[in-house]
Amino acid sequence: MIKMSKSNKERLLIVGAVIIYILLAVIFRSFYYNSLLDDYKLYGQSLKIHNDPKKFDYAIKTKVGGVLAEGKLSAETPISFEGKKYIFLEKITERYTMHTRTVTTTVNGKTTSRTEVYYTWDEIDRETKQSKKVSFLNKKFNTDYMAGMYEKHICTRSGGYKIRYQYNGYEDNQNVTIAGNTRTGKVEGIDGGYPMVYENSISDVIASKNPDSRLLLATGVFTVIYLVIALAIIGVILDSRRF
């Protein structure tokens, strides 16, 4: 019977662990790519509607299924602020507040502590105004029913001594693309849930779903994660030499 040295066993363990890990990573990547491809096909095969209220109405009444509709999204009761109109507007009040923390340092084996003072802008109040309904291609929808309407920072205004106001909102009358599904006779999410609002044209929305470009972006992130975990596995195996 051939006996293996401890170092050879460690090498085999490392090689085996890395091989198994690579196989799992490849399988995960394959599943992820297939998921992206399904999403891309779902958007690509949907009915495209370009600023056509009649076609949009027809798609709902005939329950055609997936739709990508492009048009203007407008608030029923817009909120005005500094010359512009918004579907919803948020005002955050912040106070410049003093805080303290204990900082401990060790030099030449001697540990000392001191109190450090620092300041941050802390939220003390939040107000939100919103149009209850929005209009899109002559159809009314509850604003809360639409997903993807992400607020954007508008401006920061001084409120006096140690007070400031942050304003965020979603601008009214934007040209958007809504991804939805009309299989039930109403507009739902294209793959379930709520219809999604994109601030892009139909062609740009479909291009953003391209699985190859999305996978390329994700691969960079996954590669870093893979390397960190692989190095951790190797580190654990090598660390076992101490025992």
Give each language-model segment a name.
Residues M1-K3:
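Juxtamembrane low-complexity tails/linkers enriched in Ser/Thr-Pro and polybasic
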Residues A17, V26, S30-I49, K85-F243:
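Charged, low-complexity helical/coil segments in non-catalytic cytosolic or luminal regions
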Residues V67-S74, A179-G180:
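OB-fold and OB-like beta-barrel modules that bind single-stranded nucleic acids
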Residues K63-A69, L89:
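Envelope-exposed proteins and targeting segments
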Residues Y43-K63:
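OB-fold nucleic-acid-binding modules
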Residues P78-F81:
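Soluble extramembrane regions of membrane proteins in the secretory/endomembrane system
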